[in-house]
Amino acid sequence: MNVLRTQKYWVNQFAINFACRNTYVNPMFLRYFHCAVPRAISQRALKPMDIPFLQCYIEPIDNTSFFLHPFKKIRFWWRYLFYGWWNLKKNQFLIKRTFPDRDFSIAEIIQNALKLHSGVNKALANHDLQQLEELCTLRTAQILKQQALNQPKCIWKLEKHISKPKLLNLSRAQADLKGEEFFVQAVVRLHTLQSLRTDKGSPKIEKPDIENVVIQQRSWTSPIRWQLWGSVPSTPVNTVRKTLPDGQVTFVAKPSKKSFLKQLFSGKE
């Protein structure tokens, strides 16, 4: 495989950022444990094996100058403090209170995200399907195993961290009716320089990348471990906060003035 083809392969095929960006699971799609005895006999409530991404505010990368756009910058700071920093601290306190014997410190979560990011990329490049099953959630493992079978082996390497990893969010979701078991998801931003080559003698293609890596754990499995869920995009700057009918908060794109006027004069509601 020549360099040009390798570069095309990098852009179109490889890396968690491209493989898992569309791993949002439909809310109606839940995978459950397979029980050896009927539920009527065992009376054990079935728990989902995987869940969709827990919607939250993902701090965007903002390079706006305060002197050129002071109101935009103040709005960005306010959103970060209220929806980012405060929400992270609140959820961290609640999760620590629920699981006092577990380590949910920022340093521990970031360390696990770094290990999973490197481990999954290396396993994907080396076609290590067993390792992918071990390190990834159910849905993500299925996607990456299929991708590994459709691409040649290669050598992936993390060259360096361009900026320091940052924990953006920590969330939990109830997994049973009693409220005793939970899913926990964490979002960590990684700004790295990665390289890819087909073999040791071929030239390497380097690529800087910013990824919002999502890791997840289930409180009822043993041993308790983090797994890679995928990656998600940042919340766009031009979004507005919206409360859904079920009480969850999400951010939707704000319509531009041009589209608003077009809709107004077209008579469409």
Curated annotation (Swiss-Prot):
It comes from the Eukaryota. One of its GO terms (molecular function) is ribosome binding. InterPro entries: Mba1. GO terms for biological process: protein insertion into mitochondrial inner membrane from matrix. Pfam families: MBA1 (PF07961). One of its GO terms (cellular component) is cytosol. This is Uncharacterized protein C13G7.11. It comes from Schizosaccharomyces pombe (strain 972 / ATCC 24843) (Fission yeast).
